[in-house]
């Protein structure tokens, strides 16, 4: 989760300010989508609930894509000026996200916490921060194409011995690492694809109108095309009879960890990013709550887990209850973000991500 480079409505160059506000808005949308999906319910196939579940398997990919962009922007100066990378800050961030994610997983919210995979994605990406753009695209493509078959192969070799359980602080270190890399709900071998693609996007001129148009068109094509290709391939080669069948590679089901879902979901994320970059109204006061929610994305994410664990669970039982709980949670977190940003430039947990600097306390 990165909000590095976040700016206020004043005092920034016009193009740079628009880019950062658009990223904040996209991050805010990702937070809202994850709140809706994590709140639930997810048991009915009525048209209304299917519409409510549109963010399922998409909001989290948008979150990860934006995380890669944020890391790219955070290290941009070091890359362009051939200066040392901010190793202390990056490692501090990894440690906090890992420990915080493991601690949050112990709460009774019924959510697979995503922060642990962020920590290892940052570590995984450190050798790539100075790599060429082409190398980033190759790594992202390899993760999307080779990660899912490897995921199936490991299951087959272990007789399907892992069930994607969330990783918590009570697990052994080996189980934690194995869970994050391959056996957990967000296997790094698959989820590296959108994160590294975000690293590449962060190097592009996101302020260019032509780029935002391409993101919209190519994102929509990937989102729809991969989704439509799935039933065609299933009709040609048959339905998988188990999670270990190679036909599973044709699945576009959300969080299946398969290529077509990954391409479709990442395409949706790219489309949403392109739309946010295309809009030029982010400085209007009416959208400030969404912007501030995106700037306090980590705080909002942690906050919604606490609300789920302390207030919402074991509900909701119906779609109406889920919509009410989601709307109330989003409203409360947006209000908090708005009030907090009147006084402070960073959210409470965003501020913790900054590595302690002994020079600040010495004279």
Go through the PLM ranges and name each one.
Residues 1-363:
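Alpha-helical transmembrane segments and their immediate juxtamembrane cytosolic regions
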């Amino acid at each position: 989760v990165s909000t590095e480079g976040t700016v206020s409505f004043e005092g920034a160059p016009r193009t740079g300010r628009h880019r950062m506000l658009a990223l904040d808005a996209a991050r805010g949308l990702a937070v809202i989508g994850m709140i809706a999906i994590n709140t639930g319910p997810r048991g009915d196939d009525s048209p209304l609930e299917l519409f409510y579940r549109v963010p399922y398997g998409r909001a989290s990919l948008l979150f990860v894509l934006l995380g890669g962009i944020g890391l790219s922007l955070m290290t941009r100066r070091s890359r362009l000026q051939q200066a040392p990378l901010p190793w202390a800050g990056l490692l501090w961030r990894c440690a906090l996200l890992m420990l915080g994610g493991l601690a949050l997983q112990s709460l009774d919210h019924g959510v697979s916490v995503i922060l642990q995979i962020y920590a290892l994605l940052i570590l995984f990406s450190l050798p790539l921060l100075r790599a060429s753009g082409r190398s980033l695209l190759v790594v992202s493509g390899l993760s999307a194409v080779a990660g899912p078959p490897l995921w199936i192969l490991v299951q087959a070799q272990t007789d399907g011995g892992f069930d994607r359980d969330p990783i918590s602080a009570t697990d052994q270190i080996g189980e934690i690492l194995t869970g994050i890399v391959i056996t957990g709900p967000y296997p790094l071998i698959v989820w590296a694809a959108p994160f590294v693609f975000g690293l590449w996007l962060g190097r592009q001129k996101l302020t260019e109108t032509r780029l935002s148009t391409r993101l919209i068109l190519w994102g929509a094509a990937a989102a729809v095309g991969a989704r439509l290709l799935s039933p065609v391939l299933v009709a040609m080669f048959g339905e998988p009879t188990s999670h270990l069948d190679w036909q599973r590679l044709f699945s576009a089901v959300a969080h299946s960890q398969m290529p077509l879902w990954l391409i479709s979901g990442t395409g949706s994320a790219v489309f949403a990013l392109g739309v946010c970059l295309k809009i030029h109204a982010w400085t209007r006061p009416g959208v400030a709550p969404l912007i501030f929610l995106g700037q306090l994305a980590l705080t909002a994410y942690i906050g919604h887990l606490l609300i789920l664990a302390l207030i919402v669970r074991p509900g909701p039982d119906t779609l109406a209850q889920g919509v009410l709980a989601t709307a109330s949670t989003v409203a409360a977190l947006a209000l908090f973000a708005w009030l907090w940003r009147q006084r402070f430039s960073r959210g409470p947990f965003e501020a913790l991500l900054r590595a302690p600097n002994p020079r600040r306390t010495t004279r």
